[in-house]
Amino acid sequence: MAAGVDEKDKKTIVFLHPDLGIGGAERLVVDAAVGLQNRGHKVVIFTSHCDPRHCFDEARDGTLDVRVRGNSIIPPSLLGRFSILCAILRQLHLILQITLLTSELRTLSPSAFFVDQLSAGLPLLKLLVPTSPIFFYCHFPDLLLVQGRQTWYKRLYRLPFDTWEEWSMGFADSIAVNSSFTKGIVSHTWPSLASKRSLEVVHPCIDVRSTSDSSQNPNDDDKDVLPWTKTGIILSINRFERKKDIALAIKAFASLSPEQRGKAKLIIAGGYDNRVHENVSYHMDLVDLAEGAPYHLKTATAKTVVSALNTSPDVEVLFLLSVPNTLKEILLRSAKLLVYTPSNEHFGIVPLEAMLRGVPVLAANNGGPTETVVEGETGWLRDPNDVGEWAKVMDKVLNGMGEEELKRMGKKGVERVKGRFADTQMAERLEEIIERMPKGDAAQSGMILLVVGAAVAAVAGVISAVYWKLW
């Protein structure tokens, strides 16, 4: 256990997260929970969904106390619709289940709550447990992530949720965001909230200890494991979602001449869930893009380590769906370049994972990566609309840089991550913020009840009207 707090200062911190799957938000939650636990605090994570086959190792191997609640009445969606409404109702169900329907939360006697991604339940949580302060981590305003606002009834349907998001966030005792970029977006989106609250910046982090022995020589341990290491691996790790713009990596790689590519391989790995239609359809679109005109690249898709290792040597683009941590680790250690394609990414944890393992990063010159990747030192920042510039960097890494030059760049990446984004630093920062939060007053419950009741009635009226229109 890492050096932590004195016995008298140990707290019980309860996390609330909607769906503990595999993604950047979930990685942050797991890292925050493990970090606080390593400092001596008791940590319990409540979530409405956690599939042992599709979650991070710490959530399934006993490292963390993960409890699934609030999932027995409301489904994640209704015929593919109303996902935000269902998510809110599932969160409210979870809160009611652990507070009123059982004594589970009372038994834990939480010192503080860590809530992220969904703020809708904060008023109810504050009402039922007014003495425990709430820390809310805003990854990005949800209202800016929603697609398909073209129709008037969809805009009307979203209006109460968008309003509720800002209003409910005001019930948090402290609010943090994941980057200065996100802080600017939040301040612009909700100027009233930003004027009343000081938004903390708490960068996501990674565990720097598990790679400390081998980060300086990232390829040495894995040359005999992956058959493609010597030919050059360009790696992309992202969820199979269109907003991640994975197509950019394929277009840039395909822009290289056969001589420039040589026997190099573009490996596209990432989160993939058969339940999510976009994951399935986007993977198919990417395969069609790579194989079709004008690129005509040879592709293969693998879902297991064995099938990945058995792919034909002449495969140019390899898709790996929902890679386990062990294979992801090997890929990161074996890659020559990590390409991170999303534009205006809120933060982006994958570039840190690559830099920690001595791998240079090519990322978009906007959003979170501008706070992590140092141009020309730990990687490159390029315009995501200029495929040619991305191709030039790929060519430079594959053909224009020697091993020593790549190692020097990799070493600077390791130093930057360990100096700025270590997991111990995030845990200490969270601990400091939680310690500063004032304890609530049970006498506030009556006023909160009146406010919450009026708000619920108003929202229910709007949703009901739109519900009948949509159906």
Swiss-Prot record:
Pathway membership, UniProt: Protein modification; protein glycosylation
Membrane topology listed for this record: Single-pass membrane protein
Family annotation (Gene3D superfamilies): Glycogen Phosphorylase B (3.40.50.2000)
Main localization of the protein described in the UniProt heading: endoplasmic reticulum
Enzyme class: transferase
Pfam family name, one: Glycos_transf_1
Disulfide linkage: none
CDD domains the record matches: GT4_ALG2-like
Record's signal peptide: none
Catalytic activity, reaction form: a beta-D-Man-(1->4)-beta-D-GlcNAc-(1->4)-alpha-D-GlcNAc-diphospho-di-trans,poly-cis-dolichol + GDP-alpha-D-mannose = an alpha-D-Man-(1->3)-beta-D-Man-(1->4)-beta-D-GlcNAc-(1->4)-alpha-D-GlcNAc-diphospho-di-trans,poly-cis-dolichol + GDP + H(+); an alpha-D-Man-(1->3)-beta-D-Man-(1->4)-beta-D-GlcNAc-(1->4)-alpha-D-GlcNAc-diphospho-di-trans,poly-cis-dolichol + GDP-alpha-D-mannose = an alpha-D-Man-(1->3)-[alpha-D-Man-(1->6)]-beta-D-Man-(1->4)-beta-D-GlcNAc-(1->4)-alpha-D-GlcNAc-diphospho-di-trans,poly-cis-dolichol + GDP + H(+)
InterPro entries documented for this protein: ALG2, Glyco_trans_1, Glyco_trans_4-like_N
EC identifiers of the protein: 2.4.1.132, 2.4.1.257
Membrane-spanning ranges: 446-466
GO molecular function terms noted in the UniProt entry: alpha-1,3-mannosyltransferase activity; GDP-Man:Man1GlcNAc2-PP-Dol alpha-1,3-mannosyltransferase activity; GDP-Man:Man2GlcNAc2-PP-dolichol alpha-1,6-mannosyltransferase activity
Keywords: Endoplasmic reticulum, Glycoprotein, Glycosyltransferase, Membrane, Transferase, Transmembrane, Transmembrane helix
Gene Ontology annotations of biological process type: dolichol-linked oligosaccharide biosynthetic process
GO cellular component: endomembrane system; endoplasmic reticulum membrane
Subcellular location: Endoplasmic reticulum membrane
Glycosylation-annotated residues: N178, N279
Function: Mannosylates Man(2)GlcNAc(2)-dolichol diphosphate and Man(1)GlcNAc(2)-dolichol diphosphate to form Man(3)GlcNAc(2)-dolichol diphosphate.
Family, per entry: Belongs to the glycosyltransferase group 1 family. Glycosyltransferase 4 subfamily.
Name of the protein: Alpha-1,3/1,6-mannosyltransferase alg-2
Origin organism lineage: Eukaryota, Fungi, Dikarya, Ascomycota, Pezizomycotina
